[in-house]
Amino acid sequence: MKALSKLKAEEGIWMTDVPVPELGHNDLLIKIRKTAICGTDVHIYNWDEWSQKTIPVPMVVGHEYVGEVVGIGQEVKGFKIGDRVSGEGHITCGHCRNCRGGRTHLCRNTIGVGVNRPGCFAEYLVIPAFNAFKIPDNISDDLASIFDPFGNAVHTALSFDLVGEDVLVSGAGPIGIMAAAVAKHVGARNVVITDVNEYRLELARKMGITRAVNVAKENLNDVMTELGMTEGFDVGLEMSGAPPAFRTMLDTMNHGGRIAMLGIPPSDMSIDWTKVIFKGLFIKGIYGREMFETWYKMAALIQSGLDLSPIITHRFSIDDFQKGFDAMRSGQSGKVILSWD
């Protein structure tokens, strides 16, 4: 079958031919319809320090997808041939304390699809049936293919009560923009997103965010005054991993504020901890999606009118995958979809 693989320990991803994966007793075989390129895939393409330590070579990559069930393991129940599915990219062990306690998103033995084992940038994918999620008929293939990153946004945004709150989102990548849109959709008062990338800030404006702020040109405190805010942000969603953005968030949080962190900062990032202590801030780390509460919330948000369509900016045939990666690497894109049909 046709697949995109990391074939060499150097920059790039290559089209290759690999065997169709074998179906296990508890697995589903999925014929891929559409995939989306993640920031993680760009890291793998660039072959940065993290990728060099993490990614086995050669391996099929990719973990954002939608497809159709074409094979079912003999122990699997609840699925049928033809079901349209996406899937949770974190494969968990099932026997650690968190897995047995129903907190599978906190599994200490997580294996990543397209990171630690073969991924979805291929005509067919095999995953455990436990990880598959049926897509409702009224959700398009394009939107279903980005459920993985949308799930990161939903998990982060819904970590705290947002109704009537003022929310700061730092980082206007696709996940940050989707998190801001979720916050607005579920009843936040003011949702402010910050970045220095004007293309992506404009995408945020198209998504109906209260205010998209280029912090290289505008002062966040001035924006807060403009919005009539007098006590700081109630909730912070840190999506950038940029130390200056996190420091600004700490500066502008209200006392008792709550921060969810999805962005990965440098390991040696320094902050003024007195602001955390004396403001009584609560900081929560976010990794992946809650299984499968986040997935049900994703479907419900779209079905209740959340419009994510502006975040998908580029669509290519899989044979033009290089154009897709070029768009993602340029920073001048939202989500990029690759069609396998």
Swiss-Prot record:
It is found in: Cytoplasm. Transmembrane segments: none annotated. Its cofactor is Zn(2+). Keywords: Cytoplasm, Metal-binding, NAD, Oxidoreductase, Zinc. One of its GO terms (cellular component) is cytoplasm. The keyword Zinc applies. The record marks 148 as: Important for catalytic activity for the proton relay mechanism but does not participate directly in the coordination of zinc atom. Belongs to the zinc-containing alcohol dehydrogenase family. This is L-threonine 3-dehydrogenase. It comes from Escherichia coli O1:K1 / APEC. The lineage of its organism: Bacteria, Pseudomonadati, Pseudomonadota, Gammaproteobacteria, Enterobacterales. The gene is tdh.
